[in-house]
Amino acid sequence: MKYAFFFFYATGISIIFGSCRIRDKQLPDVSISNPAQVLFDNEIQEAQQLLKEGDLVLRNGNEFSSQLIKNFSKTDKTYSHGGLVFFENGYPLVYHILQGDQNPDEKLRRDSLKRFCNPRKNFGFAVYRYDLDSIQLARLKKTIHDWYIKGVRFDPLFSLETDDKMYCSEMIRKSLQIATDGSLVLKTTRPTKKEADYYTYYLKLPASYIVNMNFVAVDNLFLNPKCRMVKRYEFDPQQALTGGQKK
């Protein structure tokens, strides 16, 4: 009994620290069987009809690294990643930045909504909308496009001081600030000492650095008077690896 407990304890520790490297296994885009496929496709089609330029799409990742990212949020820990929507030839694409096997070059990228919300890797997603006028939306789109062409990369230091490297929520915060001439500035979050000690394994940064870091948590993106939810979609947890289903 003692040896069995030690085996499971050691195995659990290995899984946790191995996952902190953000090297989650790459899964196929979306290849799920009926009827789950039909349900998920219907949700994506519905969401695409609702999307407008500049919309914020948030997803609720089901991987270990996603769970850690959710914990950076102080108030609402539902979401782990986000991106901004812009239309190309009438088709909506989600612009976002991430690292790991899903994005080896770590550059700002754009994905279809279907790929971004893949039910194999997410519990669900939501669409939010900022209160922006047409001029601000045009500036927002130009800013993100300029960064995309420039090839802005993921920032492993999570520093708000650099613009050539950014993480996803930082990119969204800065682009909104530019688009609105500073009238919309999203709040930031500062980790506690206890949180800094915990996150040091995940971020690969000293706790002394993390505790002094102003971080744009995912809930900072939507817990704002100028941001409202359009619609939220949840996949059935029992079908997380086989398909998407709305509760």
Regions found by a protein language model. Give the residues of each.
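Cysteine-nucleophile amide-bond enzymes
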Residues: 18-247
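Bacterial Sec-dependent N-terminal signal peptides
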Residues: 1-27
